[in-house]
Curated annotation (Swiss-Prot):
Keyword Transcription: no
Species name: Nitratiruptor sp. (strain SB155-2)
Lineage of the species this protein comes from: Bacteria, Pseudomonadati, Campylobacterota, Epsilonproteobacteria, Nautiliales
Name of the protein this chain belongs to: Polyribonucleotide nucleotidyltransferase
Binding-site list for Mg(2+): D516, D522
InterPro entries for this protein: ExoRNase_PH_dom1, ExoRNase_PH_dom2, ExoRNase_PH_dom2_sf, KH_dom, KH_dom_type_1, KH_dom_type_1_sf, NA-bd_OB-fold, PNPase
Top enzyme class: transferase
Pfam families the UniProt entry points to: KH_1, PNPase, RNase_PH, RNase_PH_C, S1
S1 motif domain: residues covered: 659-726
Cellular location(s): Cytoplasm
Recorded family membership: Belongs to the polyribonucleotide nucleotidyltransferase family.
Residues annotated as transmembrane: none
Annotated gene: pnp
Length: 732
């Protein structure tokens, strides 16, 4: 049945069309907003798979034709998803995954395709809304609508779903997703801004010492206080609830009859459970409290093996795999009971305790800056490299008018050996891109990248037992400091967890892998002394209460300040690798001296570049000469050499008389003539028209580099000497 619904809520006008296209799917919708058109489809396999996780795949695909473009490169088809597409697919996946019923083991694919794009549309908000609508009206047993919401803060005013042009003025980028009952997902980033200050200076330190004023810009992180952030999230939650109520009220008219699916929630053998509880509970609790992750896992396997070999197990015919599942399930029960009833965690910590932290900086002698950050059994080696403007990552958004450039990059790598897996390292996947993006958003507000520079951070996770993305944030901030880069403030991150049973709950600080696996929430918070710069929350319960969210934010703040204190102590001990750092110096000369630095046909500047291994950028109008190189002493030497050149009195040009006959050597050829090296080391131009009495197509048809020729001086103006080929002039 065809249905069309229009909504205008929260600065967003949407039109949903059901039953019009893609009718062979389990559910589909065409969503229109402004000039944006999206197709969302849901397809489910009929046969179940034997997995212990929800077999859900989400794709978000942007078509180039949606913005009137043809894909660049040699292959004129859309290729693998870009970073924005991958991150958007993750957002949709994380918001919708909690809605599926337990025991749902049917492979399901949700696809969102952008068919037309409006430059002012927030494609991530619309993608989630479209996917949720398609799932809601499908015959899959999910009857909850999810709404995405973008929240900005411009000039102190909170805005919901602002146009993208307005979002660029915001100091807050907050993305919320939830149902009419609770929030399911949060992504937040503070957006740094610049303030201007007027400072005293001189007109030109070399040429004009007159006092003047200069306007400078200072980076402000705009970290948000926990109380304000919690308040804005609460406002957003109310907005989402209203939207979801409206969606469900109308979408139900287009919803298909739900399939009666067989669900296979994970069950355990009650007899084995009872036996394990009576005989082996103490052994499992002892294994849970083993300090090392690998030791804990081995002990649990040994217990399962021990049970499988005893007489009762043999009599009952219990298999090892079945026993191990029960042991794992009982382990989860013990972990949660210890936390809720004893306030004690598997590794002996209290609920608010942070694992021991060890920090080493600049351990890589050839790198610009490095930090080995270890927290418990999680270890990140973060390395900073300083590049030039040309090293920036070029990318193009679907609706952008041209290429854009990323001058601050964070790349996160998670090799299998970090968790003891014997697998080869492969290309980064969605998880790596997501963690790198979170770390970048956490650090970006405090990093001020000069216009002519590019900073790249690479995080190599060497050990992982929870919170590796937050270790990347901590290590990244110190790696930047180790590369002698000024930060507006240090940034630290911590992962929070949640255990909920009936009316009891406990919030955990700095969760390890066990608590992430057996807990109900993964809540990552990063920030400075002043507030939060980035946050990411995923909930497994189907929602989180506002009270718990506020408490988790405050508890995260306490942990962050503790970590920042340790990081500050480490930062004070950093020994900068001065000899490794690229150096850049700008000197000011009189604009008339620029020609001396360049030299005839670029001879002098080329010699400087080759001799000192530097690059040189010149602003002719202002007389600014910027010298950049990988070796600081060579950069300084090049600057000294340039100043020597510009301070030397300009030599008088070698003077020739019109009609002088000279012998010279062809030094260089161009399409308009040849340059001849004359006595005294000066060059003269032998124009192509003077090479023959007739027409010459190519200079090389008459003379080549290295040829000795006899020429006649036709004219001289200063250093510019015009020559004629003697043998041609004699014939004339």
């Amino acid at each position: 049945m065809k249905c069309r619904f229009e909504f205008e809520m929260n600065n967003l006008k949407e039109i949903y069309e059901f039953g019009e296209v893609a009718k062979q799917t389990n559910g589909s919708v065409l969503l229109k907003s402004g000039k944006t058109v999206m197709l969302a489809t849901v397809v489910m396999e009929k046969e179940m798979v034997d997995e212990d996780f929800l077999p859900l795949t989400v794709q978000y695909i942007e078509k180039s034709y949606a913005a009137g473009k043809i894909p660049g490169g040699f292959v004129k088809r859309e290729q693998k998803p870009g970073d924005f597409e991958t991150l958007t697919a993750r957002i949709v996946d994380r918001a919708l995954r909690p809605l599926f019923p337990k025991g749902y083991l049917y492979p399901t694919v949700i696809t969102v395709m952008v068919l037309s794009a409006d430059p002012e549309s927030d494609l991530q908000v619309l993608a989630l809304n479209a996917a949720s609508a398609a799932l809601f009206v499908s015959d899959i047993p999910v009857r909850k609508a999810v709404s995405g919401l973008r929240v900005a803060k411009v000039d102190g005013e909170v805005l919901f779903n602002p146009p993208l042009s307005k979002l660029k003025e915001s100091t807050l980028d907050l993305y919320l997703a939830g149902t009419k009952e609770e929030l399911l997902m949060i992504e937040m980033a503070a957006i740094g801004s610049y303030k201007t200050e007027v400072v005293p200076t001189t007109v030109d330190p070399l040429m004009d010492p007159t006092l003047a004023e200069e306007v400078i810009t200072i980076k402000e992180p705009n970290a948000m206080k926990e109380e304000e952030l919690a308040s804005i999230i609460a406002q957003g939650k109310d907005v989402i609830q209203i939207a979801c109520n409206e969606y469900e009220k109308y979408f139900i008219e287009s919803a298909k009859e739900q399939l009666e699916l067989e669900l296979l929630p994970q069950t355990i053998d009650e007899d084995i459970w009872t036996y394990v509880e009576e005989i082996y509970a103490a052994d499992i609790k002892e294994a849970v409290q083993a300090m090392a992750k690998s030791e804990r896992n081995e002990l649990l396997k040994e217990i399962a093996k021990k049970i499988s070999e005893d007489d009762v197990a043999k009599e009952q015919g219990w298999e090892y795999e079945t026993i191990y599942k029960v042991v794992e399930k009982y382990k989860r029960k013990i972990v949660r009971e210890m936390i809720l009833n004893e306030g004690k965690r598997a590794d002996g910590r209290g609920l608010k305790d942070v694992r021991p932290i060890d920090i080493k900086t600049n351990i890589l002698p050839s790198a610009h800056g490095s930090c080995l950050f270890t927290r418990g059994e999680t270890q990140a080696l973060v390395v900073c490299t300083i590049g030039e403007k040309t090293d920036a990552q070029m990318y193009e958004m679907l609706t952008s008018k041209g290429p854009e450039y990323e001058h601050f990059m964070v790349h996160y790598n998670f090799p299998p050996f970090s968790v003891g897996e014997a697998k080869p390292i492969s290309a980064p996947g969605r998880r790596e891109l997501g963690h790198g993006n979170l770390a970048r958003r956490a650090l970006e507000p405090v990093v001020d990248v000069p216009e002519d520079k590019t900073y790249r951070l690479v995080s190599e996770i060497l050990e992982s037992n929870g919170s590796s993305s937050m270790a990347t944030v901590c290590g990244g901030a110190l790696a930047l400091k180790a590369a002698n880069i000024d930060l507006a403030d240090l940034v630290a991150g911590v992962a929070m967890g949640l255990i909920v049973e009936d009316d009891k709950y406990a919030i955990l600080t700095d969760i390890m892998g066990l608590e992430d696996h057996d807990g109900d929430m993964d809540f990552k918070v990063a920030g400075t002394h002043d507030g939060v710069t980035a946050m990411q929350m995923d909930i497994k319960l189907g929602g989180v209460q506002q009270e718990i969210l506020e408490q988790a934010l405050q508890q995260a703040r306490e942990a962050r300040l503790h970590i920042l204190k340790i990081m500050e102590e480490a930062a004070e001990k950093i020994e900068i690798n001065e000899e490794n750092l690229p150096s850049s110096h700008t000197i000011t000369v009189h604009p008339s001296k620029i020609v001396d630095i360049i030299g005839q046909a670029g001879k002098t500047i080329k010699e400087i570049i080759e001799k000192f291994e530097v690059s040189i950028d010149i602003d002719r109008d202002k007389g600014k000469v910027k010298v950049t190189g990988k070796n600081r002493p060579k950069v300084i030497a090049a600057c000294d050499y340039i100043q020597e050149i510009t301070n030397k009195p300009k030599p008088e040009p070698v003077k020739f008389q019109e009609g002088d006959i000279l012998k010279g050597k062809i030094k260089r050829t161009t399409n308009f003539g040849a340059f001849v090296e004359l006595p005294g080391g000066v060059d003269g131009l032998l124009h192509i028209s003077k090479l023959s009495s007739g027409r010459v197509e190519r200079v090389e048809d008459v003379v080549n580099i290295g040829d000795e020729v006899e020429v006649e001086v036709l004219s001289q103006k200063g250093h510019k000497i015009e020559l004629g080929l003697r043998q041609v002039l004699k014939k004339a």
